[in-house]
Amino acid sequence: MIDHTHLRLFQFCDSQFPTGAFSHSFGLETYIQRNIIHDDHTFIAWLKMFLQEQLTYSDGLAMRLVYDALENDDTQKVLHIDKLMFVQNLPKETRVGAKQMGTRMVKLALELYNNPWIAWYHQQMQDKKAKLNPAICFTMLGHYLGVDIETIIDYYLYQNVSSLTQNAVRAIPLGQTAGQKIVTHMIPYIEETRKQIFELKEADFGMTAPGLELNQMAHENVNVRIFIS
């Protein structure tokens, strides 16, 4: 039997879901223009790094901490993590891009569900107490739907892998079949990453690869672009 609560959350993983993810490469485009990424093998190496660094120590760990805060009705903890997610994201384009995606996801979630936590989160943004982040919104939605945190993180990581792969298909370019092979190849790494997230301490939050941040910053100065970040 289909678990409709999981399907409702998985709807937000659809590549056609209008959060703006298709407009962001999060530094990938810089690597492509420098010819560091030029085929499926070099893209997979980059995608593993992005998954095991930025999505582990920032988004994934934040989701685990936010879920615990929701369980304890700790609003101050949620606001603290929202602030950390914004200020530790040093490259301007990725910082602003995450805020834009978070805002779109929150507004769409409010259109679809009467979720008190997301309504509260949106109000905090209007009161200038929160920036809005897609990882936090996704966690709130999963929590509201009664989905366990392990599955919430798996879905979120999958959504990012799928979205970035579709962007790579356009930018490198790759064939659609090659893109689907990459997503299939990455599924075991998604599970490994989720397990790693549950082994981290809160003090590990925000660690990332300097080379990734530098290439995200350098994207501001690329001559020709198809992505915002």
Curated annotation (Swiss-Prot):
Gene Ontology MF terms in the entry: nickel cation binding
Pfam families (UniProt xref): UreF (PF01730)
Main localization of the protein described in the UniProt heading: cytoplasm
Compartment annotation: Cytoplasm
Keywords, in A-Z order: Chaperone, Cytoplasm, Nickel insertion
Cellular component aspect of the GO annotation: cytoplasm
Purpose of the protein: Required for maturation of urease via the functional incorporation of the urease nickel metallocenter.
Protein name: Urease accessory protein UreF
Phylogenetic placement of the source organism: Bacteria, Bacillati, Bacillota, Bacilli, Bacillales
Originating gene: ureF
